[in-house]
Each structure stands twice: as C-alpha cells, then as structure tokens.
Amino acid sequence: MSSISDLVNLNLSDSTERVIAEYIWVGGSGMDMRSKARTLSGPVKDPSKLPKWNYDGSSTGQAPGQDSEVILYPQTIFRDPFRRGNNILVMCDAYTPAGEPIPTNKRHNAAKIFSNPEVVAEEPWYGIEQEYTLLQKDVQWPVGWPLGGFPGPQGPYYCGIGANKAFGRDIVDSHYKACLYAGINISGINGEVMPGQWEFQVGPSVGISAADELWVARYILERITEIAGVVLSFDPKPIQGDWNGAGAHTNYSTKSMRNDGGYEVIKKAITKLEKRHKEHIAAYGEGNERRLTGKHETADMNTFIWGVANRGASIRVGRDTEKAGKGYFEDRRPASNMDPYVVTSMIAETTLLWKP
C-alpha cells in the first residue's frame, strides 16, 4: 500500500502527458497569497498560451457576494518544486470580468511603468533582500525562543551556526533549493540579527521580473512552512523591544548608474527620492512605523538621510560603488511586508520619469 509521501512524490510523466498548473495570486489583504490548481492537456512554457481562470472574490475579500467573479490573467511561469516533472507554478494578476484591474492588483500599474520607453532604455536592475520570521504555530512566538521567555541578547545570531543560535535552517535551505529549481533568480540566504529571523535575496533581476520572482519565492516559502508546521511572518516588527525588525531592502541600479560616471547619476536619483520621501514611506509597507525608529539599523521614518556604508540611513551607497564611481544603491526603507510591484515600480518612476 502506498503511503501519502509516495503519492505526493508520484511522477506523473511516466503515465500521462497531462500536467498540473498551480495558479497563484495576491489575496485581499494585499499580502496574503492564494492558489488553486488545474489540469492542462500538456506542457506549457508560454504564459500567453495558458487559459484565464476565475475565482470567488467574495471569499478572498476582493469582490462582493452578488458579483463575486474575479478573473486571473497568467503572467509568468515557474517550475513547480513540489510536484516537479512538467508541472508549473503560474503567477497571475486579477481583473474584474470587464477587464479592469482590481484594487489589490499592483502588477498592472507596475507593468505600465516598466514598459515606458524611458524606463526600458535604462534596464533597471533590482536585488531585493527579503527578511522574515519563523513562528511556532500554536503560540505565535519565534522558533528557538523559550515559551513565555526570551533568548540571550542579539549578537551571536546573525549568520550564526549551532543549535543554540540558528533556528529553522532546514526550512531555509529547502526554500533556497526549491527556488533554484523553480527558476527564480535567488542569490543567497543568511540568518538575521534576531534569532528565528532569516533573509533570502532575489536578483539582480530586470524590471517587473524582480517582483514576479519575489512573490513566487514568498509563495514557495509559505508552502514549505506549511509542510513544516511553522508559521511564516512578514511583520516588520514581530517582537517589540530591543530586537531588530524585518525589512525588504531594495538594491537598485540603471544602465546609466552602472556605466562610467554613474555615481553622479546615483546622487541625482537619491535627491529625487528625498523629495518624495513621504510618498515612498506611505507605500513601503504596513506597520513600518514600528520598524523605522532610528534604532536597530534603520533611519527614523520622518527623516531622510543617505550615506556611504551607513546602515542607519534611508539610502545606503556601498563603498565599492563610491570607489568605482558607478554601481548601485540600497533603499533600506521598505518593510518586509511591502508589495514588490509597488516598491520597484515606484523607485523607477521617481528616479527615471518624475520631474520635480
């Protein structure tokens, strides 16, 4: 008799040409992810060849009950690390039956910005550092922390090793490999300053692909924590007190910044970002005011400062960039629960399209 694990790992390619496509979309909170699967007659590699689909938006907080149908438009395809074979994950965005993007569809506007000829010509690159916290399921307390208590002070946990310093590495490494299998441009992982908190990086990726990849990487991570019986949190300040929050630092460059003389282009871009600081803060994640306090490697959200190698700044420029006179900069303001479609497109819009 087959066990459940045998059936979960069943290789369908031995017996059928049909494949499973898992359609993924952003739910009603703008942060939660939803998915459902359908059978296709054969392998598909081009998202334009995939059928549109619908779902009950009244059950996700995205449509009223009397007119509940929301339409999914397939946008990008990734290999499915759970079902494997020719099975796929499909990142979608959501529209009304009339073809209008619903309010939580932030991809639609981002695609407009990234298709602007001025933006296309500059080939914007993004590298996003996604921090997250793993919580014990029944008590909503970080993994590795004593129930009702606290671990030792921060210091030994960042990039730490050992059973008393690194908690949840099996989840982290499983996620790393699953993203590589899926075709996501994941570039690394590390343990973070607060115990039970980790980070993965996506990029450098061009334009809207950075946000597509980050959303699917988040999806894969939550599926893995589901299997492990652990809760995934993107709260920007999951534990109050003398503990680091969780961000999504966004590294950015354009072709002009990467070419000779790019440091001057970077400084002009930072000046633009300073002038729109309030607008960016408002769009950079819910609850970010609990994180951006001027402590724990953050700048106060009410002030804008930038500097070279300054992790207490709003915008950090690396020493390598300063020395080379070209390169990239890091926007340290986005919270861990930010929408990458919003953040990446807003940075491009402010630095490339906005005229002060």
UniProtKB/Swiss-Prot annotation:
Q: Which domain of life is it from?
A: Eukaryota
Gene behind this chain? Gln-gamma
Name listed for the protein in its UniProt record: Glutamine synthetase N-1
Q: Which UniProt keywords apply?
A: ATP-binding, Cytoplasm, Ligase, Nitrogen fixation, Nucleotide-binding
**Other facts noted in the record for this chain:** There are at least four isozymes of this enzyme in P.vulgaris. Irreversibly inhibited by the herbicide L-phosphinothricin (PPT).
Q: Which GO terms describe its cellular component?
A: cytoplasm
Broad EC category: ligase
Record's catalysed reaction(s): L-glutamate + NH4(+) + ATP = L-glutamine + ADP + phosphate + H(+)
The GS beta-grasp domain extends over 19-99
Query: Of which family is this protein a member?
Result: Belongs to the glutamine synthetase family.
